[in-house]
Swiss-Prot record:
Its EC number is 3.4.24.-. GO terms for cellular component: mitochondrial inner membrane. It is a peripheral membrane protein. This is Mitochondrial inner membrane protease ATP23. Belongs to the peptidase M76 family. Keywords: Hydrolase, Membrane, Metal-binding, Metalloprotease, Mitochondrion, Mitochondrion inner membrane, Protease. The active site is at 143. The keyword Protease applies. GO terms for molecular function: metal ion binding; metalloendopeptidase activity. Has a dual role in the assembly of mitochondrial ATPase. Acts as a protease that removes N-terminal residues of mitochondrial ATPase CF(0) subunit 6 at the intermembrane space side. Also involved in the correct assembly of the membrane-embedded ATPase CF(0) particle, probably mediating association of subunit 6 with the subunit 9 ring.
Amino acid sequence: MDVIYRSGTKLIWSSSMNDDRQTSSEDKLKGFEWWRRSLQYRTGLGLDEEEKLQFEHDYRVKNLPQKCDSCIEYRDWMFKYSPSVKFMMEHVQKLGGNLSSKNITCDMCDGMKGGGFHPEMGILLCSNWIKDKWQLEDILTHELVHAYDHLKFKVDLTNLKHHACTEIRASALSGECRILNEIKKTGLGDFGSKFQACVRRRAAISVSANPNCSSKEEAESVVNAVWESCFNDTRPFERVYR
């Protein structure tokens, strides 16, 4: 079943994937060759479109049972020990939301997305793209902010300003744009603006994938239009602490 999540892209809420591509041979999925392909994918050097698509397919299917088990293990650990996840779960519950392991699920996703939220189905964590426990914490907190916003503000995702606002808040409050993460990606330059630049970038990418958005430029314009009010709204947190 196809559903629309936070970015407006389609993720698949089942283990069946619309991908007829054949998985690469075993020697390309391990050791030096896998490391080489991973590095090539990250840098884009010497990588054509077909090789890019093949790597994404191989990454999705590589060690799937172990990835799903790890995702469930990380999720359950966060339920018990993550301050941000526990805090957001409590506030979603106060608003009448009912989220638990029954509707916060780990599964395969079609496309390079970490997760998604759907008002009726809950939260999806993309086990085939989650690298470690701490990435899952950021993703789950992000989606819990969307769940909170849906209940608190009655977000209408067909309204681009609504979509932009919840994306700004989710990226700002989840920890995914923390300074150390951005330094690893982009170096020390423009240190003071890294956090806000990351939030703007992520929000615009998500809005640009909304079917009602006509272009990247429109997405950026909408993000800018709601930026001040949405970036400074840290509810239910007192401030951005991650």
